């Protein structure tokens, strides 16, 4: 298949993503779904299929990586321009994203299956594991873009849960009213708290449309204790920029009182290489040192870590994720 037909194959017939962005995403093995959505197979999904190695979510939360689908309802829109984001730059305009949530879920599963086709018959992949992967058990809504900009997010979460699929939603926390209004909450809500204070936030996270984004993030953190779901504050730590500042991070974490805190070292990959240097990557030892200092300041301890991902889990106890009760089956004729 030549490059242009490959790109066309990976594009949704109804996509409204700008052609230049769509072509870049397709070249990076995204399958575009709906008007603004996209799916991409995670590195760790492939690792578990081939080598029985799961990602840190397996260690921390009991997630089976081969059963995880990585997607986003809006891969092309974000209201921040974070310097450390490894994804492609997003559209400079904010269009309303209102894809039908059932269509988005089914098309995402179909795209995920298409992307896994090449693993069938691979010498290192058991047919049983490949068949299990055809029906995802977990959806990581974390691929690209800011998912709380999707106007039908609560309906999408409900449809996932009705199919017995857990949801992991990663948000930058800049839209607290949207989170507050969600009728259905994700199985686990991650809030990216990637700067210790407003000055560093504005330098690293670069709000595109709202100069009060830091204050909005603080409102989201204040909201977390009232939400009836699992919550996580995630700190992406950039050496020479945001690593350290334990007292500032402790203030934010104590405000949010999350079930878990993840401290993760910045990785010098993708688009972020335009803004950072390899010396901005902390070692796993430095992430561990940060975590051991922070943990007692928030009444928690370091529960686990994964050196290859430079990440630690801070909390009170490890509690594995449980799947929602399945009320609906995927259509038998869903196909790819």
Sequence positions of predicted segments:
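Conserved AdoMet/S-adenosylmethionine-binding subsite of the radical SAM
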Residues: 122-285, 289, 293
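Short, acidic Gly/Pro/Ser/Thr-rich loop/turn segments
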Residues: 78-81, 198, 268, 321
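Structured loops at beta-to-helix junctions and adjacent beta-edge loops in soluble globular domains
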Residues: 44, 74, 144, 236, ...
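Surface-exposed helix-capping loop/turn segments at secondary-structure junctions
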Residues: 119, 229, 299-302
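Short Fe-S-cluster ligation motifs
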Residues: 103-133
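Flexible, acidic/Gly-rich N-terminal and inter-domain linker regions that tether
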Residues: 2-84, 88-93, 97-110, 114
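C-terminal accessory extensions appended to soluble enzyme cores
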Residues: 6-29, 282, 286-336
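Short Gly/Ser/Thr- and Asp/Glu-enriched loop/turn motifs at secondary-structure junctions
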Residues: 66, 134-136, 306-310
């Amino acid at each position: 298949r030549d490059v242009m037909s490959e790109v066309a194959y990976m594009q949704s017939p109804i996509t409204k993503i700008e052609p230049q962005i769509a072509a870049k995403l397709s070249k990076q093995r995204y399958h575009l779904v709906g008007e603004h959505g996209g799916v991409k197979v995670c590195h760790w999904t492939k690792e578990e299929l081939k080598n029985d190695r799961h990602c840190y979510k397996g260690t921390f939360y009991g997630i089976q990586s081969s059963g995880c689908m990585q997607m986003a309802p809006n891969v092309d829109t974000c209201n921040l321009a974070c310097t450390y984001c490894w994804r492609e730059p997003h559209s400079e305009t904010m269009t309303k994203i209102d894809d039908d949530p059932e269509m988005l879920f089914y098309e995402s599963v179909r795209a995920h299956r298409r992307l896994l086709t090449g693993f069938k018959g691979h010498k290192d992949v058991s047919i049983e594991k490949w068949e299990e992967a055809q029906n995802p058990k977990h959806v990581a809504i974390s691929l690209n873009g800011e998912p709380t900009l999707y106007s039908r997010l609560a309906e999408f979460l409900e449809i996932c849960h009705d199919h017995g699929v857990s949801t992991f939603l990663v948000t930058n926390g800049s839209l607290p009213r949207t989170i507050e209004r969600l009728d259905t909450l994700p199985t686990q809500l991650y809030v990216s708290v990637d700067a210790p204070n407003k000055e560093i936030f504005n330098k690293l996270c670069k709000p595109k449309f709202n100069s009060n984004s830091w204050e909005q993030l603080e409102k989201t953190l204040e909201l977390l204790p009232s939400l009836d779901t699992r919550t996580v504050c995630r700190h992406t730590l950039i050496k020479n920029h945001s690593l350290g500042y334990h007292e500032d991070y402790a203030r934010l974490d104590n405000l949010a009182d999350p079930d878990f805190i993840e401290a993760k070292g910045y990785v010098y990959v993708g688009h972020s290489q335009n803004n950072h240097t390899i010396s901005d990557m902390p070692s796993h030892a430095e992430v561990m040192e940060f975590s051991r200092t922070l943990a007692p300041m928030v009444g928690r301890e370091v529960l686990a870590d994964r050196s290859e991902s430079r990440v630690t889990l801070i909390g009170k106890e490890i509690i594995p994720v449980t799947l929602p009760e399945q009320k609906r089956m995927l259509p038998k004729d869903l196909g790819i």
